[in-house]
Amino acid sequence: MKKIVGHLIVLSLLCLINVNPARAWDAERRQPQSYELQQKYIHSFRQNAGFIHTERNDSIALLGDSLTTVLDSIGKYDEYFELKRVVIRSHILRGESRIAVAQSDMMYSKAQAMNHKFGMAMSLSAIGEVYSHMNRLEEAGTSLEEALKQLKDPSDNQILTKILLMQLVDNLLHLKNIGKAKLYIERINEYLSEDLSPVEQALFYNYNAYYCIQAGMPDEADNYLKEAWKLEPMLPVGIIRHLLIAEAAYYESKEEFEKALD
């Protein structure tokens, strides 16, 4: 009996000794998985020029906080703020406006305390989008313009710069502010096609078309839409929806209402 008890004690001690290595191994095993998820979400945001419709996936909202906590703890602040931006967008798309407002405010406070310009730009971009979804378009425009100013050297953050320019044009066209929209359209048109992804090209054509429709130039709008549709095989469904809406607006401007409804 004593021998059995002795063996059990030894086995128990061995199990206790091996708990920490097992936990460490599990943490090491999961770290690459966390990194892959972070990169997946950020890559999707960048490649789709901020117009991500797959972000309704619960995984982003559910895992986002834990992933950003990891980035914060290891001091990867550029990645932290960019991923936080993606998480806030996912909450907006899920209809969780209160969560999006709270997180964007906290994000801005953190970036401001750190004097982290990229983080402040990302935060203001998120705040601008929250305002847009709440139909507070004037406040949205102010936040987006301030976000653009925070980029010390826009050439270092071309992807975010392009996203902000498109957000601003979209905002100004909704406000029917054609004159100001034209200024940002001109900045958009400075980019060369070879420096743009297919999604970026399509969206640039799309916003040029919208501008031309509002400026009373339907034929030019039609030309931009035709160029955008050439990229259709390379575009995700969400971007194609944007083109369909622009096309409907074009037909409406031509008073071809049956085509607009198709």
Question: What role is predicted for each listed range?
Answer:
Residues 1-6:
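Positively charged n-region of N-terminal signal peptides that target proteins for export
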Residues 8-16:
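Bacterial N-terminal signal peptides
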Residues 21-262:
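A "functional boundary" signal
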Residues 7-8, 90:
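Short helix-onset patch at the extreme N-terminus, typifying the N->h transition
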